[in-house]
Curated annotation (Swiss-Prot):
InterPro entries: DNA-dir_DNA_pol_B, DNA-dir_DNA_pol_B_CS, DNA-dir_DNA_pol_B_exonuc, DNA-dir_DNA_pol_B_multi_dom, DNA/RNA_pol_sf, DNA_pol_B_thumb, DNA_pol_palm_dom_sf, DNA_pol_type-B. Keywords: DNA replication, DNA-binding, DNA-directed DNA polymerase, Host nucleus, Nucleotidyltransferase, Transferase, Viral DNA replication. Belongs to the DNA polymerase type-B family. It is found in: Host nucleus. This is DNA polymerase catalytic subunit. It catalyses: DNA(n) + a 2'-deoxyribonucleoside 5'-triphosphate = DNA(n+1) + diphosphate.
Amino acid sequence: MFFNPYLSGARKPPNLVAKRSVAKTFLEIVPRGAMHDGQSGLIKHKTGRGAIMFYRDIKHVLENDMAWPCPLPAPPPSIEAFARRLMGPLKFHTYDQVDGVLTHDTQECLSPRYRHHITPSGNVLRFFGATEQGHSICVNVFGQRSYFYCEYADGDLLRDLLASVSDLVSEPRMAYALTITPVQKMSIYGYGTSPIPNLFRVSISNWSMAKKIGEYLLENGIPVYEIRVDPLTRLVIDKKMTTFGWCCVHRYEWRTHKSSTCDFEIDCDVADIMAVSDDTSWPVYRCLSFDIECMSASGGFPAAEQTDDIVIQISCVCYNTGGTGCEENTVFGTSGLHLFTIGSCAPLAGVDVYEFPSEYEMLLGFLIFFQRYSPCFVTGYNINSFDFKYILTRLEFVYKLSPGPYSKLPAQGRFSMYSPLKKFVTTTTTKVFISGTVVIDMYPVCMAKTSSPNYKLNTMAELYLKQQKEDMSYKDIPVKFISGCEGRAQVGKYCVQDAVLVKDLFNTINFHYEAGAIARLARIPMRRVIFDGQQIRIYTSLLDECACRDFIMPNHKGADNSSEPTDVSYQGATVFEPEVGYYSDPVVVFDFASLYPSIIMAHNLCYSTFVAPGGESPPESDVLTVELESGLSYRFVKNTVRNSVLSELLTKWVSQRRAVRETMRSCHDPVKRMLLDKEQLALKVTCNAFYGFTGVVNGMMPCLPIAASITRIGRDMLMRTSQFVEENFAEPCFLHNFFNREDYSGDPVAVKVIYGDTDSVFVCYRGVTAAALIERGPSLAHYITQCLFVDPIKLEFEKVFGSLMMICKKRYIGKIVGETELSMKGVDLVRKTSCEFVKNVTRDIIQLLFDDPEVSRAAVQLSRLTLDELKMQGVPPGFGRVIQRLSQARDELYTSRARVEELVLSSVLSKDVSLYKQSNLPHIAVIKRLAARSEELPVVGDRVFYVLTAPVDGRSSGVRNYEIAEDPTYVREHGVPIHADKYFDQVIKSVTNVLSPVFPPQTLRKDKFLLGILPHRIYLEPSFLPYCVKASEHC
């Protein structure tokens, strides 16, 4: 069919940005207090006056093409002037990419040179970035086909099949260009030396149609490969391009009628773009941090779906990131601080304040501002699940205004949010997509980067910035807002403060540099690094390696489908139960460096080396067989037959990380050093993700034989290490080779491995000083490595515990030699669910055990007593200090001297309240009580805090926690008494968990034993106190 690209006036299309206009009629919602100070309620009516705003008392009509009134940086040069400065190819840095589909009748002003790529329809890949001169640019790349592989008997028959399938897939359906080519490729899944028979590459010009057709073939049992690989991934792999870094375009044409809002826009062919691989520097990019304040008509916490729950203020902070630090600091506005508010507002120092008559006009003004400023990165705190969600919901449901045209692609852009309704939904699964802008919510970033009892902005500001925010209750915000312009200024100051704090967090944590490094390494867009987890990183990297080796990657029906049954299970790497007890002799800890990656490399494990049942089978001498404890066995060819793709990829990245770290040592430029550090961190994180990629049954390409073999080999390595240590480390010859006479403590030398878990070995070394073990530790680790393992597996010396309490598997407390703080794992002190009171009591008792020699000796003595001996001799005297601390804690609880703040418990709200099937959970009960009182409600991902209160009916037992759980603020403000029995029971359990190794071995109920050695006391109700006298008055 012939397509004339110039029909319908496509030669000179209109300017897509300037053509749009703002609706003159809209719903006006205004708080009464914005017009009449102090009055509550809303004014709502339709108006046709047109949208306006006021800036410095000057009225401005809101139009999409309006000049923004605040002070602005100098505009970019004209296309002609800029083009004259360029000599040769155009170099630009890309940070974001968007794929799309254009048809032959597109309204975009496209040169005839590129029109054949979209006839009848074709992919366009838009690379957003910045030029070397710092100007924003959009590079439209044409000619990248979508393709996948398909097994079929005949190419002509396959073409007929695809033609019929094209009419069966879901709407919208479009015409496309199709090419079918026979190819010689092998599947990476399973060892084999023969290409896949009757294999064709199906190349389709339209990604939307290619995806639908591929999925249809897969669902109908036709063998297909790589059907979910999008055209952007095809380009970066086929061309060895980058998704985050510097690129070069050799031949291109300037767009005079742009489809984007960037300073400049060019079109090019896919053959004319390439990456500049050596340069990892950043240009200057624009960033925006924002925050919103809302007001509920009901007085409760606002809900966006409620028409009367409006946004009243929006704060924005404009700033730059990247660059070398030598660039001129351009400011958008007076100082980069902006406040959008309904109603008049008193001036705020250094803040550009925009006043709007209604919510609609304020939201519209924010969207126009957003597009004028055109940020490359936007950040905030919980903006994915609240701020963006709130604004987008208001625009869609209340005002019927599409925000897409306010992205960097006014005609085809997206400005949307996606919240999948799954069983376990957290804030990190809420995705915000803005064409040309990368969204980095600092709330999930902080949750991933640190362990904290809560992740409120104030807590993170204290942790990272050593700052405290001036807090304002959501209940106070409406009161101040409607009080007058001064009150609105107070709310505005609070709103701006939050956006500034997030900007400082953004620049302190520097997650954007880390995400950029991962994007460059894994060849995926930066937004996918942020939102899509580890699987896509490994999949794309593996796809890249396959392309170099004529391998292709298979697809499976659904996430659960793999070549192995999903009920295949394998045991983790914990080797043996620990020798529980208190150790006063030194305990040496050895760790395997990068255990799982090194196992893959050392043993040539891979999809491509796995000998599948019924497949090609080389001689047994060329095969590694891994026997599982279940009786199953898996076989892999050795590297003499075929090198593992996973191994080669890991080897390359490990070497690359070593080189980067070496470069860091001699780098004195702080910016370059920070970029290098993020690069080596990206390499480390991605290397460690390989094991999870193969072991997740519902992952993108699971292979349980690989995952099970890795864990089995890891278990065997720990067992061999344990056996080797116990057989050799106490032998006279060994001791003579490694230790001198002064290294011995005087006790008989005895060596015992007391624990082995995943990648660590704990060795109790009696008779040798801790100082000697620290000095000789690296040599001991090197000796084990040489004797037992092959490269690159390496055992490393980590630390020496001077004393250690081994409680049970994955739980221990110890004091590392040379450090003052205790090292803990798995105990209540490091659990976020425990209250501070319990932690403090437990911590005090642990400190007594490790710091007080008398208590330590008493603990060892107690652990060696039988129950009969204990009845005769009593508890060792030194243990009395532990009993005294427990008695003190009991007194504080039963006499109401414990502070409410110390008694707060918490649980994570992991999904929406409506999705919980159990109603008898304390944190859910608290949320329901908060809702009944119209209090501020936590969002998904938050920790919900509560206190256990005394039951109103006076019951002391049989009370469930959810019946007495209450909000801490409510308890404090209303003086609600606490449930002392519940809290002291937690104290006893926590201390028992820590001290149980020192209790007599025959003790069955260790918590009962601990309660039994405490002195008995009776606590009277407060009403009896007037009738009591002090003991001293009887004397």
